[in-house]
Amino acid sequence: RVLDAEIVGEKNKKINMGKAKFNWNEIPLSKEMNTEWVEIDFVKTTFLNKPHWSGDTHGFCLNIGNPHIIYFVSDCSKINIKELGPKIENYKIFPERVNVTFASVSADRENIKVNVWERGAGQTKACGTAACATAKAAWCQGLANVNSNVHFKDGSLQIDCSTDNIFMTGPVSEVKK
């Protein structure tokens, strides 16, 4: 697919990432379920009552051009993503596998830290669709503002969910020629 982009300042680009899909068959999931409340048994038993896990043990699923599940926790840096990421990525309810994000939303509701497991790639330092999916899920659940900054290990992106389409703004650099 082709995405529209505009230049913002010297190094930033603003990209229209399109609309999020929330229907179970568009993510896709293997069976009909509430995509805002997806529970996986081993996640629940592994993390229930752990100090870095706040709230419920459910994930929020959506598709931003690829499937994502987002877990909101008090400290995403404490999650062993290398252990849990591949188990969730390949879980039976995800016929096309899934990107896995653990996210921590700041008290000001404007900043979100993430720890991402990208399907087929493993732990990643940054992922644009994960940033968009996380910001949209946080906003839909009333955890974050409509505009937020998503922080990865190696950088940040500004995400705007104020319209049906999601807009991502951040620096662009050449990685490989």
Please give the residue ranges for each predicted region.
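Short amphipathic alpha-helical face segments that pack within enzyme cores
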Residues: 129-137
